[in-house]
């Protein structure tokens, strides 16, 4: 038996071996990017921040005019996620991707609003968040600004700005890179939300700037409130604000907090970001 025949995914509630074909070339996610997804961290066989993930998914589906009624309930989806992790014998933490896409044929205008859903699970090989000893080296990518739209806060299949930014980071030998919106403001990185610290105040772009409405972004803001550290949501950052910051860090639900050590000619340290990760770990009992 090949390795992929021992691993499974869930497609519309059915366990399917990983290597099996799932759909035809007329699939709307493939043809038109007519899909939305959530990336979820599993710890101790349970999805972290599940309520927030589900809330964002349902809101995004509503914006895209997908039929929420055709999706299983929150509890049924959660059980499908945890069952898949167990079936794939993942004993460390896992990365789960839950993708929802519109069914049916048609060209740009769909013939129906009902959805199909797909769950994939990969072993992260570690347990719990680990604050990194080494900081990131980052750059800024300006060739493909992210356009502000009703779907900007959500993770959709139309991810070309992030793909191109990821290529830019690889070509320039940096760990991550920041992207800008159509107004030229720095709003996030290609896979994370952005925070920076100046004079012990935390700044982060507001959702209306075009950044992803990140689940871990929300966790950081709540952790800062518990630590009584002020958070200011702003329209985004300029290059000067990035250079002038005391601390920069990036967040996503898979990696947690990653601190930035170098941006252009500046060097940074990690202080508040380390306190925030510790507070989040304690709050979610990791």
PLM feature spans:
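Ordered, amphipathic secondary-structure segments that act as subunit-interaction surfaces
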Residues: 81, 87-100
């Amino acid at each position: 038996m090949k390795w992929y025949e021992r691993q499974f995914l869930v497609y519309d509630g059915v366990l399917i071996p990983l290597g099996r074909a799932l759909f035809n070339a007329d699939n709307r996610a493939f043809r038109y990017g007519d899909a939305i997804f959530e990336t979820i961290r599993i710890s101790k066989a349970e999805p972290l921040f599940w309520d927030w993930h589900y809330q964002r998914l349902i809101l995004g589906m509503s914006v895209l005019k997908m039929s929420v009624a055709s999706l299983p309930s929150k509890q049924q989806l959660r059980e499908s996620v945890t069952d898949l992790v167990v079936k794939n014998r993942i004993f460390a933490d896992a990365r789960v991707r839950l993708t929802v896409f519109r069914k049916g044929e048609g060209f740009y205008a769909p013939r129906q609003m009902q959805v199909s859903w797909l769950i994939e699970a990969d072993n992260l090989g570690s347990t719990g968040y680990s604050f990194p000893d080494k900081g990131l080296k980052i750059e800024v990518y300006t060739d493909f600004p992210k356009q502000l739209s009703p779907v900007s806060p959500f993770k959709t299949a139309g991810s070309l700005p992030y793909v191109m930014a990821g290529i830019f980071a690889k070509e320039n030998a940096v760990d991550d890179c920041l992207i800008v919106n159509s107004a030229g403001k720095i709003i996030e990185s290609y896979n994370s939300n952005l925070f920076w610290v100046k004079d012990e105040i935390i700044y982060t772009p507001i959702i209306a700037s075009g950044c992803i409405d990140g689940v871990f972004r929300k966790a950081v803001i709540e952790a800062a409130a518990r630590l009584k550290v002020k958070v200011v949501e702003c329209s985004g950052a300029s290059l000067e604000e990035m250079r002038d910051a005391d601390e920069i860090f990036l967040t996503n639900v898979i990696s947690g907090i990653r601190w930035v050590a170098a941006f252009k000619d500046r060097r940074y340290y990690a202080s508040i970001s380390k306190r925030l990760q510790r507070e989040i770990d304690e709050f979610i009992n990791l």
